[in-house]
Amino acid sequence: MAAVNWLKDEPYPEKPTRRNHLSFGPARLPTGDWDWIMTYYKPEAREWLRTMNNPLWSGPEDVLGLLPAGVPVTEKIFVKEVYPGLKGFLQMFIPVKVAGCLLFGFSPLSRTGMATLKTAPVFRGGYAPAAPGIPMQVYAWEMACKIDAAPRLFKWELIVGEYFVRLATLSECSAGGDVGAYIRGGRPISIEAAAVKTRELASTLYLLAQNNVYHGDVKIANTVITEPHGRLGLIDFEMAHPLDMTMSGLREGLEVPIKWDMVCTDEYRAPEGHGPFPDILSAEAQLVWQVGLFMLDVIGIEIIENRNQGLWEQPDFPGLAAREVGIGRSLLACEHRAFLDYLTIARGCLRTNPRERPRLTLLIAQLTKFIREVATQPEH
């Protein structure tokens, strides 16, 4: 983290003037919720806020619209809940929205100017076997960053108390929330782009597994895009683990409370369950299943409501899928053959028998072939 401190040594109020007004990039703010920024942050911080230029912003309304949902960080929230314990993170981060344990705001450390500060209890996990003293979720996140498959992690701090463990992280902020929220926000995806994002996800999971890193909770809500045409990234590494789950506890004497049957959101768990998972092939079959669900999710097929019905195993699934997608809402118009071929790949990932699912390398090859073929088809 850059050795620059934008916080005032002692906060003191300043009145906004015509020359000394508060703006977030092209959005000039009326007097209100964020006047406290002038009290706590130095003039150079406010000057940077005025000059922010994110390529995703087409006008003032986009400045706050692309930050994930949340309520404004008022002076009361800042003073009581943020400022006392997080000063080390606030030196180069200005929070403007809050949602639960997440603060969204702006930082020059980020390529887009947008950043996220998260501070939350750690209930599961341990230290990374390959990096003593580094929490597994931080190790997994940094490993994903090395392959450009996660928002950049700028700073982290593990706070270990007698009865609790908390982790604070400052990182790049995604555009408009997770990939599903981004698309539902009026940005329908093409069938080619959906396949590209799926290939990026599969490639990321393969490379992480090669380094004995498993995310632990793969789903569309844990995938993001940080910049225009940028690579898909993973977030929320709280359940990250090595294959054999062997980790030392974050607190001395505490057994690591994480097992294979605990990781993964229930709706995204493959039908065979986790079991002990003694080998890489079984773990990879789980990942492929989750990639298949992502393929349906990203084009607007709500799998959570339908997965227990085995919707994709029904003979009339393509017709049902076409009606549920609602062309134009989540998916741009495409050739019918391309739509069917895409569903065929997804259904292959969702076979009940894990041995019948493709390996990640084969899935990546299938998606590459599909993308190449779709690219030669006429546009609609």
UniProtKB/Swiss-Prot annotation:
Q: Under which main EC class is this enzyme filed?
A: transferase
By what name is this protein known? Answer: Protein kinase ORF15
Keywords attached to this entry: ATP-binding, Kinase, Nucleotide-binding, Serine/threonine-protein kinase, Transferase
Q: Which Pfam families match?
A: Pkinase
Task: Please give the organism.
Answer: Ictalurid herpesvirus 1 (strain Auburn)
Enumerate the spans annotated as Protein kinase domain: 93-371
Family classification: Belongs to the protein kinase superfamily. Ser/Thr protein kinase family.
Catalytic site positions: D217 (proton acceptor)
List the catalytic activities from the record.
Answer: L-seryl-[protein] + ATP = O-phospho-L-seryl-[protein] + ADP + H(+); L-threonyl-[protein] + ATP = O-phospho-L-threonyl-[protein] + ADP + H(+)
One annotated GO molecular function is: protein serine kinase activity
Keyword Transmembrane helix present in the record's keywords: the answer is: no
Q: Name the EC number(s).
A: 2.7.11.1
Return the InterPro entries for the record: Kinase-like_dom_sf (IPR011009), Prot_kinase_dom (IPR000719), Ser/Thr_kinase_AS (IPR008271)
Q: Which PROSITE patterns match?
A: PROTEIN_KINASE_DOM, PROTEIN_KINASE_ST
Q: Where does ATP bind?
A: K118
